[in-house]
Amino acid sequence: MTDVSSPASPLRVTAQVHVRADPHQVWDLMTDWSRQHEWIWATQVRGGQGLGATVVGWTGVGPVGFTDTMIISEWDPPLRCVVRHTGRVVRGSGIFEVIPVGTESEFRWTEELELPLPPAMGKLAGLVIRPIAEQGLAASLRRFARLV
């Protein structure tokens, strides 16, 4: 959804997958930043654990890419982790939620990104970016589900 009153145009993208593992197993892999490259394409991540910890990611192929700095703004094991993107390229929030389903889980990943664009351009960019981003998140979550 695009907010026409804001100078930065927000973009919300969500994907979800069923995982045949209990919430603690999902949480452990989800917050093992050093393993994110196993399920998120073209990404290397390192960082701490817990509220206020810093997480740093590199998204790209070879030398072409960008650094994504984040601060953990919510930490509620094994259910919810929110990171605040603070870099120059990516700003907004990444929300990772684990929903218990019996002895298994649903893993929902939402990105609320602040596009540095005027509202009209943000709306147009959202039409282009959203389906690509949704497919990327969904593909990553399918890989994640196979790892646990």
Model-derived features: where do they sit?
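Short Gly/Pro-enriched turn/cap motifs at secondary-structure boundaries
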Residues: 7-8, 60-61, 85-88
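Short beta-edge strand/loop motif at the mouth of beta-sheet-based domains
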Residues: 14, 34-69, 75-80
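Intrinsic-disorder/low-complexity, polar/charged segments enriched in Ser/Thr/Lys/Arg/Asp/Glu/Gln
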Residues: 10-18, 54, 67, 80, ...
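Hydrophobic pocket/interface hotspot
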Residues: 26-30, 36, 55-57, 72, ...
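Short strand-connecting beta-turns/loops that link adjacent beta-strands
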Residues: 22, 50, 77-78, 88, ...
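Hydrophobic/aromatic beta-strand elements that line small-molecule binding cavities or substrate pockets
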Residues: 15-17, 43, 68-74, 85, ...
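Beta-strand/loop substructures that line and gate deep hydrophobic ligand-binding cavities in soluble
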Residues: 86-139
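Hydrophobic ligand-binding cavity/cleft-lining segments
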Residues: 1-50, 146
